[in-house]
Amino acid sequence: MLRAIGRVYFRLKVEGLENIPQKTNFIIVSNHVSFLDPLVVMAAVPKKIYCIALRDLYRIIWMKWFLFLTETLPSGSVSEKAVRLLTRNKNVGLFPEGGVSRDGTLNEFRRGAALLALKTGRPIVPCAILGTFEALPFGARFPTPRRITLKIAKPMYLLKEFDTVIEDTYLQDGIFRVRNKVKEMLYAGK
C-alpha cells in the first residue's frame, strides 16, 4: 500500500536501487526533513526496513498506532534493539539528525549509525530524500502532492583497526563520511 501511495500521490522516483545489498543486511541512513521520510524509505526499498523513531512520538495515540503498524521501533535503547535486528539478518533504518529538520536543511548526524555499523560489521547505505519537505514540512497537518526522490548511494563499510574498544574517533570519522555522502547527493546539481 505504501508503494502505491508513494508512486501515485508523490510520484516517487528512486535512483540507485541497484546499490541496495542483496547478500547482506544493512543500515539505511538518510536525511530527515519530514515525517514522510521513513515512509518513503519503506515504500521505495523492496526489502523490509525496521525504522527507529523518537520515543516521544509514542505518546501521540494515533502516531503510536501507526508506528506499531509499520513495525517502527522506539529510540532510547536503539543500539540494543538494532543490534539484535541486524544480527538476525534484518535491515534497520536510521535518521541520525535526531529529529525532523524544521527548516529543511541537513543537520549534524549523531553517532548511533556508525556505532551500529562498527558493532555489527554491517554496511551503511547512505540515502538522500528530496521533496518531502515541500510535501509535508514541519508543522503541516496534511501532505500535498509533490515529486519525491530517494537517492541511494553504494554501501559504506566502517571498519575499525582493532577488535577491542570502539574509539570515539572511529565513530566521528564514520558518521562524518556518511553525512558527507548524504550531503553530496542532496546538493548534486545545485
What are these language model-derived features?
Residues 11, 25, 48, 147-149:
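A residue-level signal for beta-strand positions that form part of recognition/binding surfaces
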Residues 1-11, 59-70, 139-145:
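Alpha-helical membrane-targeting segments
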Residues 20-81:
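Catalytic core of membrane glycerolipid acyltransferases/transacylases, capturing the structured
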